[in-house]
Amino acid sequence: MDKKELVEKIALNTLVFETLGQPEKEREFTIQDLRRWGFDLILGKKNGVRTFFASQAGREVGDKWEEGGATYEIEEILLELPENKKLFAHIETSEGVAYIVAELREGKENLEILRTPAPTLLMAFFKKHRLHELANNLKSVGVITEFYKQRGRESLPLPYKKLPLVARDFLERAKKVEKMAGFGRVALAYFGKTREKDNRFRVSWLLPTIALFDIDISEKANTALEEFK
């Protein structure tokens, strides 16, 4: 079988498992989640106006700085969300770049407190919490994030009934993660084992980006990829 024919055979025999649904437009988070991302919720002044905003952790009360053409001053570092306010975040894209946008909400009023590139923050989040499988296998980040993992030489993929337990376990774990996230897609080509009994495979896994900023979901996704080896 030549290379072109093999590529075609792999495409035709890759197994696809989908948790169908519309990726959520936004997700509610806690102030603890914000800290896990590396930010504090601040009550202070932005361009001289008293308001709430997010600042990278490590700054102190009284600190003043300029960033992105705006001036900031910290009056208080909050330990809880302000009364009657909730924290929501969603993903926006501009010129091919995904941004995470966090807002404080009270009724119909939204106050944007954070807007930063999602790929950079997501990678920092994975590394900070030692989610090495997610960090090492991150492929691309938009509204949907792709992870891609490959082991060994490619050959004709095996059918589902011939998958070993380790591959089936991964699919089961992935399904549970996708139900938590509300959407997901796994494309798996399992090629068999090497002479040393190592698994040969390639897998692409799609998950909603905003859901990956939930530590519980990311930890379970990391475990799923980690155990598939």
UniProtKB/Swiss-Prot annotation:
Matching InterPro entries: UPF0128
Top-rank lineage group of the source organism: Bacteria
Cysteine pairings via disulfide bonds: none
Any matching Pfam family: UPF0128
Stated family: Belongs to the UPF0128 family.
Protein name (Swiss-Prot/TrEMBL): UPF0128 protein aq_756
